[in-house]
Amino acid sequence: MSNNEIVFVTGNANKLKEVQSILTQEVDNNNKTIHLINEALDLEELQDTDLNAIALAKGKQAVAALGKGKPVFVEDTALRFDEFNGLPGAYIKWFLKSMGLEKIVKMLEPFENKNAEAVTTICFADSRGEYHFFQGITRGKIVPSRGPTTFGWDSIFEPFDSHGLTYAEMSKDAKNAISHRGKAFAQFKEYLYQNDF
């Protein structure tokens, strides 16, 4: 592995494309370039509401699978409904799989409060075996599905600062500028450019 290679553990092709777009954008910082390597490992998901604990469990599994000394990161995303005290949270993937987008929207139908927050938590294990966390949060509301339904729950989440568009209706660059994932990876990218890893 070269000095600036890091491994991203994900089997989600859409997530990989989005992260590549964010992390590999040119940054004028000591001519440092990040080389992203993808590993699609099958990691067990800790069932918990603590997003750092979930990300750390996945990070430790990734280090165990790939071997110590390789900079590696994992990412976990949650969708928290205000009306449900933060649920489904990290369980959103399972809600999507078992219910689908339409039924998730219907869950909030009886309630006036449709507000939610999208959260991305990154766990990065550096080459020294130290773990670092980065988190991005975007506030918004749950709406009936609009736009392409090819990327998780993007078509039902309308950020407050999106001018009335769901994530799915936004351009990639516009979404990355305000999204939970974009915010978390902006922090992570800054860390990578300022530190040896």
From Swiss-Prot:
Its GO CC terms?
cytoplasm; nucleus
Report any Pfam family annotated for this entry. Answer: Ham1p_like
Reactions this protein catalyses: ITP + H2O = IMP + diphosphate + H(+); dITP + H2O = dIMP + diphosphate + H(+); XTP + H2O = XMP + diphosphate + H(+); N(6)-hydroxy-dATP + H2O = N(6)-hydroxy-dAMP + diphosphate + H(+)
Q: Which residues bind Mg(2+)?
A: E45
Q: Name one GO biological process term.
A: purine deoxyribonucleoside triphosphate catabolic process
Q: SUPFAM superfamilies from the xrefs?
A: ITPase-like
Give the matching InterPro entries. ITPase, ITPase-like_fam, RdgB/HAM1
Give me the residues that bind ITP, please: 10-15, 58, 76-77, 93, 151-154, 175, 180-181
Question: What's in the keyword line of the UniProt record?
Answer: Cytoplasm, Hydrolase, Magnesium, Manganese, Metal-binding, Nucleotide metabolism, Nucleotide-binding, Nucleus
> A GO molecular-function term, please?
UTP diphosphatase activity
Cite the cofactor comment: Binds 1 divalent metal cation per subunit; can use either Mg(2+) or Mn(2+).
Give compartment(s): Cytoplasm; Nucleus
**What cofactor is needed?**
Mg(2+); Mn(2+)
Query: What are its E.C. numbers?
Result: 3.6.1.66
Q: Which CDD domains match?
A: HAM1
Record's keyword annotation contains Transferase: no
Highest rank taxon of the organism: Eukaryota
Task: State the function annotated in the UniProt record.
Answer: Pyrophosphatase that hydrolyzes the non-canonical purine nucleotides inosine triphosphate (ITP), deoxyinosine triphosphate (dITP) as well as 2'-deoxy-N-6-hydroxylaminopurine triphosphate (dHAPTP) and 5-bromodeoxyuridine 5'-triphosphate (BrdUTP) to their respective monophosphate derivatives. Xanthosine 5'-triphosphate (XTP) is also a potential substrate. The enzyme does not distinguish between the deoxy- and ribose forms. Probably excludes non-canonical purines from RNA and DNA precursor pools, thus preventing their incorporation into RNA and DNA and avoiding chromosomal lesions.
Quaternary structure? Answer: Homodimer.
Q: Which family does it belong to?
A: Belongs to the HAM1 NTPase family.
Annotated PANTHER family? INOSINE TRIPHOSPHATE PYROPHOSPHATASE, INOSINE TRIPHOSPHATE PYROPHOSPHATASE/HAM1 PROTEIN
An additional note in the Swiss-Prot or TrEMBL entry is: Present with 3490 molecules/cell in log phase SD medium.
* Name assigned to this protein: Inosine triphosphate pyrophosphatase
